[in-house]
Amino acid sequence: MSSTTAFRQGIYQFDWARRVVRWLDAMPNAALAVEVAPDRVAAARWSRTGSLDGYAVESLPVGALAPSAVEANIVNGAAVKAAVTNVCNHLDSQDEDVAMILPDTVIRVFVQHFEDFPRSAAEAVPMLRWKLKKSVPFEADETLISYMRQAPRETGIDVVTALARLRIIREYESLVEGIGLHPGVVLSSSLAAIALVEDEKPTLLARVSGSTLTTAIVRRGVLCGYRCTELPAHGVNLKPQMLLEEIFPVAAYYQDTWQEAIQSVRVAGLGTRLAEFVRPLEEEFHCDVRSLLHSAVSDGRIKEDARPLAERDLEGLIGWMLQRG
């Protein structure tokens, strides 16, 4: 299936109660997933019973990949292609479907409220294009769009819309097509990782990847807020207050819109520095703050065979594993 078909005919299926995030109408079933991140390429394969068959990780040289929704992403084509080839060869991948997990920056996600929303895609897609045309710096004919109606509220309905630039998605798809694989499902890393969030109460996910922060709020099967931003600093230079300032707009929006407080915070991507951020987050939100992966392991949502992925901080791949079944 082409990128255009996948985005335009597919529906962004956010059935959080069953932990499903996918681009396509069909239930995701690819046994192989490849995640491309600024610093590495990782791949994993699962058996028919859902257990981890194997995984591989290859580091990328600094600057080999520059995630962007607008400009070319692959800077060092030889290095990125070699990394993708190596991880796929390690898993004996050939002539099969593959799910692609991409940097959050590549796919723009919006949560919008409508008093009334068309039931047919023929009416909905043009309306969404018109409403969001000023939110993306590329032309409509270059835009891949997918959307999903969420559970209705007392008045109106919330719709999740995802936009991406066709030629950017094609950059990533060509990486696996070049070695005989068939890209189908395409999603961003944090949307895959949200499958690890327990959502019985309003939970905020703050996920750092390089210089990017993705903040999402999930509540009882509904994606209530989402924001992907560039941090003013990263690595050892990132300070708790910097993180809080970028998280605050999403948290404030949720509290104003839903009239309730955040009751749980999960954090990913800070590694050994997590402890520095826990106290400031607890003081701000007055709730439990924990590592996304550690909480998922302790709560039993990550099976024993997938622990190696957790140890490598591959929450995007683990999230895909949960989504596929």
Model-derived features: where do they sit?
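Hydrophobic/aromatic-enriched cytosolic interaction surfaces used to assemble or bind macromolecules
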Residues: 1-325
